[in-house]
Amino acid sequence: MALLQIAEPGQSPQPHQRRLAVGIDLGTTNSLVATLRSGLAESLKTPRGNDPASAVRYLPDGRRVGRAAKAAAAVDPLNTVLSVKRLMGRGIADVKLLGEQLPYRFAEGESHMPFIETVQGPKSPVEVSAEILRVLRRRAEEALGGELVGAVITVPAYFDEAQRQATKDAARLAGLDVLRLLNEPTAAAVAYGLDRGAEGVVAIYDLGGGTFDISILRLTRGVFEVLATGGDSALGGDDFDHAIANWIVEQAGLSADLDPGVQRHLLQLACAAKEALSDSGSVTLAYGPWQGELSRERFEALIEPLVARSLKACRRALRDAGIEPQEIAAVVMVGGSTRVPRVRRAAAELFDRQPLTDIDPDQVVAIGAALQADTLAGNGRDGEELLLLDVNPLSLGLETMGRLMEKVIPRNTTLPVARAQEFTTYKDGQTAMLIHVLQGERELVKDCRSLARFELRGIPPMVAGAAKIRVTFQVDADGLLNVSARELGSGYEASVQVKPSYGLTDGEIARMLKDSFEYAGGDKAARALREQQVEAQRLLEAVQAALEADGEALLSPAERAAIEAQMQALRGVLDGPDAAVIETHVRHLTQVTDAFAARRLDASVKAALSGRRLNEIEE
């Protein structure tokens, strides 16, 4: 849907004047910019006819961006930043987990954000990404001969809120107006002609330099819906390079404790070997006095565990979508790493059909983003509009009594979305409520990820359960979350926009999904136990309050003793592991207090009617 355009009174947009917009694939290894010219989408190359590497080298008197920077990585590793996409939206603790894969010196900034120490001082991942985006913007404006109105920038489907916000911040630093963040698999589907009325279910297999995404899409005329997404935020072609580099270290008898320069050189050798093996049966490698031959078969054995990880994510996504492999009408391959023959064979074996590789897998995402950018800029395409429906990768919810996770927006819900649920107070006279926002698939708070906390104050004091608090979750098209809470009686409201100070650690999303399946049975039992404990505690507090208020007036000593004995029995099993035992004691306490509850009700009615005439009651 086109963005709203506003003109001065009496003016109208020129119908044949195109507004300049681009699509940007901000990749881990390479970054591309594409646009529409004469109705055709094309990638805008550098003057040398290639795409810039996602690399920035900082020098005392300036900086270099692209392939020139990447070429210097082996001789100046501490000042040359590669694969910065892996650092976007992450904290210093996450960076330390990556260990030897990142040969940089890090400093901790505000909110535990990592900064890379360079000769120009500390640089954040956002600043590094902005350098790459700035080069892409300038190239586009030079090629198109004008100023850009904006860009659609692609991100992995599994980027969380912090990573998406970091991408937007980098674009802002680069002087770019972000029309939209678009999931990379979504962009690939657009590039393959969604707007031409294709129908059916399609799998997008996206294996780039640093991330893997699988999306199951339903394509119908004018509507694009993502049925399910999955993937691995720490799996890509870089890992293939590391597998070969580790093999070289082993074969050459090198020490495992290598300095950054040697690491860079080995990775460059590995990357060249990987690319050569896509066309050749073997390749000769040399490092120092060592020389060896790496066959395609041996290479495929080295990467087989990595390929298997991608297939496992594919099967999980199919299960989430409720789709069998044979129902997939087409498999679209995205990302330079899908050129590896073993990867293509694996996808063909899983889905029982040859994957589509008609469009350059390195360019397909940028081209799809360019098509979407052209539409959002208001240029339109053949008078048609395109509806893109992305999904959130993990469930969003909040903490309820008993430290339980109450899901408000389930995972794989189509975005943008707004969902609301009503909650109430737990204690008499409660005037504030702490809202704890969570992300994850497990039943208990301790097994989910905390996103934010905020407090709603001003709740009118009343008995427990009387107040009504409506909590609304809103997720926009870019996956950013806003949570608000409103007390319906007083109108008091509080809200928070979730921009975590750091993102998920590598593999955390995959682990969270895996755990939700493995522990489903235990989680269900644990939730049932917690719910029963909360109900029992609420009953105990209510009965205790009733005894203090009316026990002396409405109960005989024997009746009171029986109730208190049953209360003590319930307290004795309250912290036990058996929900059924607690439920039995709750039922016994309810039965022994039934007569007491009836007397209290009668007393309340008599008090309400005392001194009133019959005609007053009838009125």
Curated annotation (Swiss-Prot):
PROSITE patterns (alphabetical): HSP70_1, HSP70_2, HSP70_3
UniProtKB keywords: ATP-binding, Chaperone, Nucleotide-binding
InterPro entries in alphabetical order: ATPase_NBD, Heat_shock_70_CS, HscA_NBD, HSP70_C_sf, HSP70_peptide-bd_sf, Hsp_70_fam, ISC_FeS_clus_asmbl_HscA
GO MF term (any one): ATP hydrolysis activity
Stored CDD domains: ASKHA_NBD_HSP70_HscA (cd10236)
Keyword Transmembrane included in the entry's annotation: no
Biological role: Chaperone involved in the maturation of iron-sulfur cluster-containing proteins. Has a low intrinsic ATPase activity which is markedly stimulated by HscB.
Family under the similarity heading: Belongs to the heat shock protein 70 family.
Protein name, per record: Chaperone protein HscA homolog
Source lineage: Bacteria, Pseudomonadati, Pseudomonadota, Gammaproteobacteria, Pseudomonadales
